[in-house]
């Protein structure tokens, strides 16, 4: 049975997928219509602030990718901590299958991408693009099917997505960091100690965490490590429970920010990153090794990796198929993990530093693979549910 909190999470994530789709479509219309010049100028408006000798100035698109997405990763960190302490990740037995699937869903897509691009060192930087899963879109498709999809499969997908996001965070920290600044690292370390002190003293004032979180974000941004990691680090120091009080600061902040993430941050990210120009894109661009690596990595690599690794784990007795599901419905869910969209676009921006070297075919490939995975995953899950209904009806008739 799903808890009320889990049901609310599913509904918000699924409805948020509609906003994501709308934002992406609007961006495509802007980029390929008469508003393309305005759209591109808007994305590159310089914004920033100065404090004494300190100056922080970036184009709007980088404020979104480095700033707003840090808030997204902050909420992701809160969800992860809550799940580890009292949620789905608390029970090791429930984590085995999603963890195995997440590993397969990273290894196989990355291998497929590398096969196509190992001869070009710059192109090969995008190996992590097809390893991500967009939870909002995948859950959106599942919610359309409603009760046809067992709750156990929804829990499996969410748990896999959480583990997948943790791996994405580690990948960004290890492989997509720039030139490192020891001074900025030192400042970040001091701030982290401050956050640790707040946690140990069980301070429940949001403003204290906010101030230190902003300082941490700036120091991490200047350190050469991607600034979004500051969000995850800050989240881990937010107390789940407060002494002498029934309220949870972590849950309170998560509740306050979740709507902004779902209906503002992610749609804005989609709007500024999904505006792909279709001018000059033809068969040559779509058959480029990067495009093939992304499309085949997301569409084939994710489903083969997740399903294949889970199949082996189940057959060896390390895990069990989710309750009330069959191999067909489980396979349909594995196909949905090929919906990369937001996270894949985000890793794409880190891989190629927002250049248009591949004429946006790399971004278009993410959209193509995500759409194919979404449509086919829906069809397979629907077929599995119809087949299950027929078997149940036949069993009822035979009982009479």
From Swiss-Prot:
It catalyses: Na(+)(in) + 2 H(+)(out) = Na(+)(out) + 2 H(+)(in). GO terms for biological process: regulation of pH. This is Na(+)/H(+) antiporter NhaA. Keywords: Antiport, Cell inner membrane, Cell membrane, Ion transport, Membrane, Sodium, Sodium transport, Transmembrane, Transmembrane helix, Transport. The chain crosses the membrane at residues 9-29, 60-80, 96-116, 127-147, 155-175, 180-200, 210-230, 263-283, 294-314, 327-347, 366-386. Gene3D superfamilies: Na+/H+ antiporter like domain. It comes from the Bacteria. Pfam families: Na_H_antiport_1. The gene is nhaA. It is a multi-pass membrane protein. Belongs to the NhaA Na(+)/H(+) (TC 2.A.33) antiporter family. The lineage of its organism: Bacteria, Pseudomonadati, Campylobacterota, Epsilonproteobacteria, Campylobacterales. It comes from Campylobacter curvus (strain 525.92). InterPro entries: Na/H_antiporter_dom_sf, NhaA. Na(+)/H(+) antiporter that extrudes sodium in exchange for external protons. GO terms for cellular component: plasma membrane. Its main location: membrane. It is found in: Cell inner membrane. The keyword Cytoplasm does not apply. GO terms for molecular function: sodium:proton antiporter activity. The keyword Zinc-finger does not apply.
């Amino acid at each position: 049975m799903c808890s009320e909190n889990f049901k609310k999470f599913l509904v918000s994530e699924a409805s948020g997928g509609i906003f994501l789709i709308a934002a992406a479509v609007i961006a495509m219309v802007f980029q390929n219509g008469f508003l393309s010049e305005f759209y591109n100028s808007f994305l590159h408006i310089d914004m920033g602030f100065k404090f004494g000798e300190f100056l922080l100035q970036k184009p709007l698109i980088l404020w979104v990718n480095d700033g707003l997405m840090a808030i997204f990763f902050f909420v992701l960190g809160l969800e992860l901590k809550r799940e580890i302490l009292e949620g789905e990740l608390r029970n090791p037995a429930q984590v085995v299958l999603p963890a195995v699937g997440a590993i397969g869903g990273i290894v196989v897509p990355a291998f497929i991408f590398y096969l196509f691009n190992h001869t070009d060192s710059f192109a090969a930087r995008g190996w992590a693009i097809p390893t991500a899963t967009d939870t909002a879109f995948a859950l959106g498709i599942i919610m359309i099917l409603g009760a046809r999809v067992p709750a156990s499969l929804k829990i499996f997908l969410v748990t896999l997505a959480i583990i997948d996001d943790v791996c994405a965070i580690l990948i960004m920290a290890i492989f997509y960091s720039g030139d490192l600044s020891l001074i900025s690292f030192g400042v970040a370390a001091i701030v982290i100690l401050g956050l640790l002190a707040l946690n140990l003293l069980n301070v429940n004032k949001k403003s204290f965490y906010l101030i230190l979180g902003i300082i941490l974000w700036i120091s991490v941004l200047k350190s050469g490590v991607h600034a979004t990691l500051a969000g995850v680090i800050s989240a881990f120091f937010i107390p789940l429970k407060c002494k002498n009080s029934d309220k949870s600061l972590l849950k309170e902040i998560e509740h306050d920010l979740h709507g902004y993430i779902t209906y503002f941050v992610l749609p804005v990210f989609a709007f500024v990153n999904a505006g792909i120009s279709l001018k000059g894109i033809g068969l040559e661009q779509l058959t480029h090794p990067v495009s093939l690596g992304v499309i085949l990595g997301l569409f084939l690599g994710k489903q083969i990796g997740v399903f294949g690794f889970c199949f082996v784990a189940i057959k060896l007795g390390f895990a069990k198929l989710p309750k009330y599901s069959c191999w067909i419905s489980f396979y349909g869910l594995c196909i949905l993990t090929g919906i990369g969209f937001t996270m894949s676009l985000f890793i794409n921006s880190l891989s190629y530093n927002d250049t248009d070297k591949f004429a946006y075919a790399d971004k278009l490939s993410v959209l193509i693979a995500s759409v194919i995975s979404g449509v086919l995953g829906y069809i397979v899950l629907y077929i599995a549910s119809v087949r299950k209904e027929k078997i149940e009806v036949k069993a009822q008739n035979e009982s009479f």
